[in-house]
Amino acid sequence: MAKEKISPGMQQYLDIKKNYPDAFLLFRMGDFYELFYDDAVKAAQILEISLTSRNKNADNPIPMAGVPYHSAQAYIDVLVEMGYKVAIAEQMEDPKQAVGVVKREVVQVITPGTVVDSSKPDSANNFLVAIDKVGSRFGLSYMDVSTGEFFATELDDFSSVCSEIQNLKAREVVVGYDLLETDEQVLVNQLNLLLSKETEGYDDVHLIGNSLTDLESSVASKLLQYVHRTQMRELSHLQKAQHYEIKDYLQMSYATKSSLDLLENARTGKKHGSLFWLLDKTKTAMGMRLLRTWIDRPLVNQASIIERQNIIQVFLDNFFERSDLTESLKGVYDIERLASRVSFGKANPKDLIQLGHTLAQVPVIKAILESFNDDALSGLLQELDALPELESLIRSAIDPDAPATITEGGIIRDGFDETLDKYRKVMSEGTSWIADIEAKEREASGITTLKIDYNRKDGYYFHVTNSNLSLVPDHFFRKATLKNSERFGTAELAKIEGEMLEAREKSSTLEYDIFMRVREQVERYIDRLQSLAKAIATVDVLQSLAVTAETNHYVRPVFNDEHRIAIDRGRHAVVEKVMGVQEYIPNTITFDSQTNIQLITGPNMSGKSTYMRQLALSVVMAQMGAYVPADSVDLPVFDAIYTRIGAADDLISGQSTFMVEMMEANQAIKRATPNSLIIFDELGRGTATYDGMALAQSIIEFIHDKVGAKTMFATHYHELTALSNSLTHLVNVHVATLEKDGEVTFLHKIVDGPADKSYGIHVAKIAGLPTDLLNRADTILTQLEGETVVIQPQEKVLSQEKPAIETHVNEQISLFDDFTENPVLQELRDLDIYNMTPMQVMMAVADLKQKL
C-alpha cells in the first residue's frame, strides 16, 4: 500500500511539534485551537472534549480535538494545573492574504511555573524555581513571572534545597546540572514537581547585576533563559535579582511550618484555621501576598522588627484615620499583575482603567498617612509615588466605560485625539443624516411604514413591504428581495453610508493605534509602579496586623538579650479564635536565663501540644512584627524553630514514623544554636518503650549539654522527670487535672512540677470502652506500677558504663489471671492510635464496641 500523503498543513504541525515534544501543542486554525495525534487523544480524556479525526476516510485517520480560541484559557488552565506544558502556535498572517499554508509559530509555552493569564486569577504567588550546583554548594533562584519578583541564594545541601522549594510552594523546577537519580526521584515523586532542564544562561547585566555570587548568578541566568525561551518576548516587568540568605530570616522547615498551621491548615490544606487566615485583614492582592511572605519569613533583625511594630502602634493609636485608610485601600487593584500584563502586551482597556483608579487612590492614601504626623511613617511616605502624570494620561485617554477588548472601539475618550473626534463626528452626524433621509423619503413617498435598517451584508437600506411596492420612488434601486418585502437603496443613502463606514474603519484603526501608544507609555513606568506596589502592600499588611491586634486584644512584644522567655497569660492565636475567647484557657510560659528545657508531662488530650505550639506561634508573630495574644510578652530573638509534632509514616519514601522522628530530631540537634527554639512532642513513641525512653533521655541530655537551645519536650515517659535532679537547666511542668469522686477533669493549665499520673484509662473511658475492660485495665495498671524504673544521670552512665535506664522488675506478673481474654483485646492492642486521626480512632472504638 502506498504511503499516505501528509498535507502541507499537517506537515507544518509535525515540524512545530517536533520542537515541543513535552508539551501539548495548541495549533491555531481559524476560530479553533486544534490538537492532533497523541495530544488529541490525551487532551480529549483530560478536558472531556470530543475526539474526532482528520481524513476520516483514510486508512489511518489522524486523531483530532479542538477548543474555541475565545474560551481556550480555561482549557489551558486545566492542563497546566495538572502539571503539563502547553505550547501555543498562532497564525502569523491573515489567512485571506496568505499564499499557500498560513504561517504559524509558537508564541508562548505556558508551564506550571510561568502562568501569567488565568481564567481563575489567584492572589497568591506562583514561583518558578531553578537549581544549580558547583562542588558541594547549591544555587537556588526563584521568580514569579506574573509579578516580576526575582531572588537568588546559596544553600549548603540538597535537603535545604528541598525545604526551600517546599516553602515556596513551587510546582516547577528548572535544573541546571546533572541530577543524581535519587535526587530526581525526591523532586518528582515526593515533591510532585515538574522538572525542566536548562544548561544555558541568559546574560542580562540589568537583571543579574553584580550583587550576586558566581553560583547565584549562574542559577539566576539559567532561570532567565528558561523564562525567555518559554515566554518568547522581552519582559520589562522582571525585577533585578535580589540576593538573600536563609539566615536573614527565622529558619523553619516546611514540616515545621505545616505542623504550626502557618499558611494553611495541615489537616484540610485550606487557608481557614491557619495563622494566615487569622491575620489576613488585607484589602489588596499585593498586601495578601506580602502577608504570606512575612508569615513565611519572620525577621531576625530586631531593629527591623521594631520598625514594623512602631507603625502598627501608630495605626492602633489613630482608629478613625486607620478606618479611612482601610477604605482607600479597597480601591487599589493588583499593580504588580497589571504591570506584568502591560509588559506581556496583554493589558486591555479594563486593565488600564483599574490602574488609573489605583493611582487616583494614592494621593488619598498618602494624605491619610501624613495626617498621622509620625516619623515612623516617613520611609513609607517617600515610597508612595503617586505618578500624577501617568494617572492623568490614563484618565484623559481611556474611556471609563471602555470594553475589555481592544478591537471593538469605544476605548479612547472624546477630546483626546482631534482626528479621532472628527471621525466620530462623521459617524454621529451620519446617524442623524440617515434619520433625516428616512423622514424625508417617508413623507415624499407616502409609505408610512418606510424605515431604514442595517445589516453587514446589505449595509443601510430602505425596508418596503410588498403591499407598498407600488409607492416606491423611481430613484430607489433594489438591493435585495425577500418573501414579504424588498430592500432598496438610494444614491444619497449610499454616499452617507460610505462616509460613515470609512470613518468607522479609520476610527477603529486609529483608536487601536492610540491605545497601543498609551500602553507603551505606561510600560515606561513599570519600575516605579512596582516600587509603589511594594509600598502599598506594606501599608496594607501593617494595617491588617493593627486590626487583628485591636480586635483580638494582642499586645506588643518586647525583646531581650538575656535569653529569657516571659509570656504572661499567653494564648494560641488560632485555637482561641476557633474556640472563642471565653472558652480558651490562657497559660503563662516562663524560661529564665538559666532554664533551657521544659519537660512537659500530662495526659493525652490535655493540651500539651497546644501549649507548645502557643510558644512557637508567639515567636513567629513577634518576629514578623505582629502583636501577640497575651497580657505581656518578653522574648529573645530566635534564629530558628525546630519541631517534631505529630506522628505519621512517610509513605512515599517508605520511612516509618520512628525514622521520620529520628531524622527530624537529627536536623534539630545538628543545626540548632543557643538562639534556637526546639519543640519535641512525644519523641520516641514510634519504637519500643525502653528504646524510646533511652533515646528521649539521650536527646534531652545532648540538647542540655551541647546545644543549649530553648526547648519544650513533651513526653509520656514520666520516668524522665527525674532528670531535673541532674540537669540544672531543665525544669518539669505538667498539665493540671482535677480528681473528684472518681471523675477526672483536664484543666488545660500548665503548672510547675511533674505529672503523677497519665490518666490513659480515663481517656479510654471518654472513648467509650466497656466498663469491665476498663476495670481490668485499672487492676493491671496497679500491678505494673509495682515495677520501678530508675533514671541514671549522664555522669553516672559515663562513669559506670551502664545503660541510661535500668529496670528492676520484682517478678513476672500474670496480666490475665482469672480473665479469659476476649479477642477484642488483641484488636485493641493492634490499634496504632498514634498514626490514626481522631475520627479513625472513634470509628475503630465504635467497631470494637459492636463486637463486645
Curated annotation (Swiss-Prot):
One of its GO terms (molecular function) is mismatched DNA binding. Belongs to the DNA mismatch repair MutS family. ATP binds at residues 602-609. The keyword Magnesium does not apply. This is DNA mismatch repair protein MutS. Keywords: ATP-binding, DNA damage, DNA repair, DNA-binding, Nucleotide-binding. CDD domains: ABC_MutS1. It comes from Streptococcus thermophilus (strain ATCC BAA-250 / LMG 18311). One of its GO terms (cellular component) is cytosol. GO terms for biological process: mismatch repair. The keyword DNA damage applies. The gene is mutS. This protein is involved in the repair of mismatches in DNA. It is possible that it carries out the mismatch recognition step. This protein has a weak ATPase activity. InterPro entries: DNA_mismatch_repair_MutS, DNA_mismatch_repair_MutS-lik_N, DNA_mismatch_repair_MutS/MSH, DNA_mismatch_repair_MutS_C, DNA_mismatch_repair_MutS_clamp, DNA_mismatch_repair_MutS_core, DNA_mismatch_repair_MutS_N, DNA_mismatch_repair_MutS_sf.
